[in-house]
Amino acid sequence: MKCIVGLGNIGKRFEQTKHNIGFEVIDYLLESNQFKLDKQKFRGAYTIERLGGEKVLLIEPMTMMNLSGEAVGPLMDYYNVDPEDLLVLYDDLDLPQGQVRLRQKGSAGGHNGMKSIIQHLGTDNFKRIRIGIGRPTNGMSVPDYVLQKFSKQEMETMNKVIEHSAHAVEDYVSNSRFDHVMNEYNGEVS
C-alpha cells in the first residue's frame, strides 16, 4: 500500500494559504474521486481507498505543520507502510510559484513539517512533491508569507498546479517507476 500525505495547518484561517498547498492537493484528490477523510487516529485524518486500482492511504496530519511526523509516523507503523512507499506533498519557498519538483528522497530543506516526518521515520528515503510558492518580497517575513492566502491571480495558477500535482500522485500510485513520473511532471506548470 502506498501512503500519500499532504502537509498543512488545520483550521479555517489557514485554508488556501501558501503553507497549505499539500492539503489542497489531497482535497482535490478526495473530491475528484469522491473520497472522504473518514477516519481519525494518531492525530491524523485519513482514508484508505483504491486509486488507479491500487490501495492507498491518504493522510492530512491534524497536528499543525511543524509536528506532522507525530501523525505520519504512527499511521505508517499502524498500517505497516514502508517509507519507500510514502509520498509527501508540501510547499517550497525555494521554487518559483507555479513550479513542481518531484524527488526520490532528500533533506527537509528547511521545511519544519518535513523535518518532523524525517525525525519520526528515522529516514529521508521517501518520495516528495515540492510545490513552489516562491519567496516573500518587500520585506515580508517568511512566517507571514507562508500563512498568507493566495491572491485571486495566484490562485488561478495554483489551481493548475494542484491539478497537475494530483495527476502526478495518481500516476505514481498506478506506475511503480517513480523516475518516469518525475520526468513527466517536473517543471513549470502552465
Curated annotation (Swiss-Prot):
One of its GO terms (cellular component) is cytoplasm. The record marks 9 as: Discriminates between blocked and unblocked aminoacyl-tRNA. TRNA binds at residues 14, 64, 66, 112. Pfam families: Pept_tRNA_hydro (PF01195). Its main location: cytoplasm. It comes from the Bacteria. GO terms for biological process: protein quality control for misfolded or incompletely synthesized proteins; rescue of stalled ribosome. The active site is at 19 (proton acceptor). It catalyses: an N-acyl-L-alpha-aminoacyl-tRNA + H2O = an N-acyl-L-amino acid + a tRNA + H(+). Keywords: Cytoplasm, Hydrolase, RNA-binding, tRNA-binding. Its EC number is 3.1.1.29. PROSITE patterns: PEPT_TRNA_HYDROL_1, PEPT_TRNA_HYDROL_2. It is found in: Cytoplasm. The keyword Endoplasmic reticulum does not apply. The record marks 91 as: Stabilizes the basic form of H active site to accept a proton. One of its GO terms (molecular function) is peptidyl-tRNA hydrolase activity. The keyword tRNA-binding applies. HAMAP family: Pept_tRNA_hydro_bact. Belongs to the PTH family. Hydrolyzes ribosome-free peptidyl-tRNAs (with 1 or more amino acids incorporated), which drop off the ribosome during protein synthesis, or as a result of ribosome stalling. Catalyzes the release of premature peptidyl moieties from peptidyl-tRNA molecules trapped in stalled 50S ribosomal subunits, and thus maintains levels of free tRNAs and 50S ribosomes. Monomer. This is Peptidyl-tRNA hydrolase.
